Regions:
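Extracytoplasmic/secreted proteins, especially bacterial periplasmic and envelope-associated proteins
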Residues: 69-76, 102, 110, 114, ...
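C-terminal motif of bacterial Sec signal peptides marking the signal peptidase cleavage site
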Residues: 15-18
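Short beta-alpha junctions and helix-cap segments that line functional grooves
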Residues: 141-145
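Bacterial N-terminal signal peptides that target proteins for export
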Residues: 1-8
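A non-catalytic structural micro-motif
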Residues: 85-94, 109-140, 153-166
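Periplasmic peptidoglycan-binding/tethering modules of Gram-negative envelope proteins
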Residues: 20-88, 161-166
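A generic structural micro-feature
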Residues: 147-151
Length: 166
């Protein structure tokens, strides 16, 4: 009986894993990927922020310049964050695995700073923001193709605080 329950639990986990959207970071350079439908998610929730607004913007190789698609996502993030003033954010800067650890940490810091500066200029209080660079230390995918590396050239806005943290 215990083996049967374990087998059913394993089957459920595998079935859910098969449903995961691996293609969430499409789109082109200086933008962000497509986001899945939000369904009936509470607008104040982190799930809404992550899936409907988007928590990630992408960058071109060796650049920390924000493109129009990235700015549009950041504008939406600022508008959402201004509705929920109890929320704070950490902006994570990331790079692909090419280059040295030191170079990529500096590049990640420049990317996070570019996002912070844009968000402050768009009306978000600087006291609600912090930045961190992970360089190439936290890739979304470990790979050796340009298409795959592009997913790792990003900044991620991580939201904290508030009641609706689901």
């Amino acid at each position: 009986m215990g083996l049967r329950k374990t087998g059913l639990a394993l089957a459920a986990v595998l079935a859910l894993g098969a449903c995961q959207n691996g293609g969430i970071f499409g789109g082109g350079a200086n933008g962000a990927g497509q986001t899945p439908s939000s369904g009936n998610i509470e607008e104040s929730s982190l799930a809404y922020f992550n899936t409907t607004i988007g928590d990630t913007v992408l960058f071109v190789v060796n650049e920390a310049t924000l493109g129009d698609a990235a700015k549009a996502i950041l504008d939406a993030q600022v508008a959402w964050l201004n509705q929920y003033p109890d929320r704070t954010i950490t902006i994570e800067g990331h790079a692909d695995e090419q280059g040295t650890r030191e170079y990529n940490l500096a590049l990640g810091a420049r990317r996070a700073a570019a996002v912070r500066n844009y968000m402050v200029s768009a009306g978000l209080l600087e006291t609600r923001l912090s930045i961190v660079s992970y360089g190439k230390e936290r890739p979304l995918a470990v790979c050796s193709t340009e298409a795959c590396w592009a997913k790792n050239r990003r900044s991620v806005t991580v939201v904290a605080g508030g009641i609706g943290n689901v």
